[in-house]
Amino acid sequence: GQPKAAPSVTLFPPSSEELQANKATLVCLISDFYPGAVTVAWKADSSPVKAGVETTTPSKQSNNKYAASSYLSLTPEQWKSHKSYSCQVTHEGSTVEKTVAPTECS
């Protein structure tokens, strides 16, 4: 079979355009992992976030590895009221965590 591949994780903060439209969505991209099963957990500061999370089913990429994404929908108030948000991806027993922090400037 294929060798296991750890996912690469990229976390995108809400865009300024989106915040101006009074929305805030964090996007966690998970790519190049094998086998195609991951667990995604979101954290605000260090407390778990359950509401507003949507994670896609992993799909096979052209290189036969898998990719998935997870979305966290927030209000701008929620986004600004925490020091940081983290996307925690667990794959085959190992965990990758990426963190974004809201900037002060609007």
Curated annotation (Swiss-Prot):
A Pfam family the protein falls into: C1-set
UniProt entry tagged with the keyword Signal: no
InterPro entries tied to this protein: Ig-like_dom, Ig-like_dom_sf, Ig-like_fold, Ig/MHC_CS, Ig_C1-set, MHC/Immunoglobulin
CDD domains reported in the protein's UniProt record: IgC1_L
Annotated signal peptide: none
Ig-like domain residues: 7-101
PANTHER family named in the record: IG-LIKE DOMAIN-CONTAINING PROTEIN, MHC CLASS II-RELATED
Superkingdom classification of source: Eukaryota
GO BP terms, alphabetized: adaptive immune response; B cell receptor signaling pathway; immunoglobulin mediated immune response
Annotated GO MF terms: antigen binding
Subunit composition and interactions: Immunoglobulins are composed of two identical heavy chains and two identical light chains; disulfide-linked.
Localization per record: Secreted; Cell membrane
Keyword RNA-binding attributed: no
Major localization class: secreted
Cysteine disulfide partners in this protein: 28-87
Entry GO terms, CC: blood microparticle; extracellular exosome; extracellular region; extracellular space; IgA immunoglobulin complex; IgD immunoglobulin complex; IgE immunoglobulin complex; IgG immunoglobulin complex
Keywords: Adaptive immunity, Bence-Jones protein, Cell membrane, Disulfide bond, Immunity, Immunoglobulin, Immunoglobulin domain, Membrane, Secreted
Cited function: Constant region of immunoglobulin light chains. Immunoglobulins, also known as antibodies, are membrane-bound or secreted glycoproteins produced by B lymphocytes. In the recognition phase of humoral immunity, the membrane-bound immunoglobulins serve as receptors which, upon binding of a specific antigen, trigger the clonal expansion and differentiation of B lymphocytes into immunoglobulins-secreting plasma cells. Secreted immunoglobulins mediate the effector phase of humoral immunity, which results in the elimination of bound antigens.
Naturally occurring in which organism (per UniProt): Homo sapiens
Name of the featured protein: Immunoglobulin lambda constant 3
General remark: Alleles IGLC3*01, IGLC3*02, and IGLC3*03 display the following serological isotype: Mcg-, Kern- and Oz+. The Mcg-isotype marker is characterized by Ala-6, Ser-8 and Thr-57; the Ke- marker by Ser-46 and the Oz+ marker by Lys-83. Allele IGLC3*04 displays the following serological isotype: Mcg-, Kern- and Oz-.
